[in-house]
Amino acid sequence: MNAGLRESLQAVLDQPILDLLPVSGGCISEAWQVRTAEETVFVKLSTGLLPGMLAAEAEGLHELAKSGAIRVPEVIRLTEDFLILEFIPAAINPPSDFWSKLGRQLANLHAYSQKIPGFHQDNFIGRSPQKNHSTANWKEFFWQSRLLPQWEMAVQRGIPNTTKLLWQQLESLWPAPLEGSSTQASLLHGDLWSGNVLVSNNGEPVVIDPAVYYGDAEADLSLTYLFGGFSAAFYQAYHEIRPKSEGFARRQKVYQLYHLLNHFNLFGKSYTQSVESCLGEITRQ
């Protein structure tokens, strides 16, 4: 396998490969660190991926880079088989100002906006398809393009009747749970959890693996509270630039529901309780 991969990459890079090292840690794509005489690059393979996943990632990285707000790996080359990215050496421990710097950078990213929510192409959230058809109404967009597709997949995967009853309550309340959401369509990373944040070897924040679209900035912020959360310094720095809006606690749960449903669909019924708890909090408020 490595000999064939080496040959294919040498043809794409048009230079001999000195080292080819597998990179662990990703749960979706196979990845390699590739060193030539001129550069070291990070290569993702299309093996095992759905069609269009690498292209969607490349487009998301391009969009984030356009904002100039936060560092992402530079896209060097995209082919049918490979996504070749800038290799960014990572530090083990973040410097003391890392989280506050990330908070400010995310707030600046969210200042980069367009008129309506959505994106010019569909993409993926993990391995799940993510619809991005633009609509002028954010609440409608989040229901039709975020919650409903995930819910329909969850039903197909056998989500229990107890969860269905809670979903029916949410349906009857909609769109009230997103009352007070921002009308500004901010540029969002889309999958901003701690596993998609790196510390470069010079201490700079780097974000990877985006699921980019434009929408309420709180959608990005809400995910940061799940799966371990971010440092308090991150939130303090973020809110110094973008103050927290009234009603965030309920909207936060709505935005988290999207990701919890996605985890149910990707990883199975161990996420049932988390989905039900989130639905319960939304519908009780």
PLM regions: where:
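Activation segment
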Residues: G48, A90, L148, P205, ...
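ATP-binding pocket architecture of kinase catalytic cores
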Residues: L21-E140
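Short helix/strand-capping connector loops at secondary-structure junctions
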Residues: V254-H263
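Active-site Asp-x-Gly
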Residues: K131-W143, E152, S181-L187, S194, ...
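An alpha-helical support segment within catalytic cores of ATP-dependent transferases
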Residues: M1-A11, Q114-L187, S200, E281
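Protein kinase-like catalytic domain
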Residues: A65, H110-S113, R242, N265, ...
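Conserved N-terminal boundary motif of the eukaryotic protein kinase catalytic domain
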Residues: D14-L21
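ATP/Mg2+ or Mg2+-diphosphate-binding catalytic cores
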Residues: H263-Q285
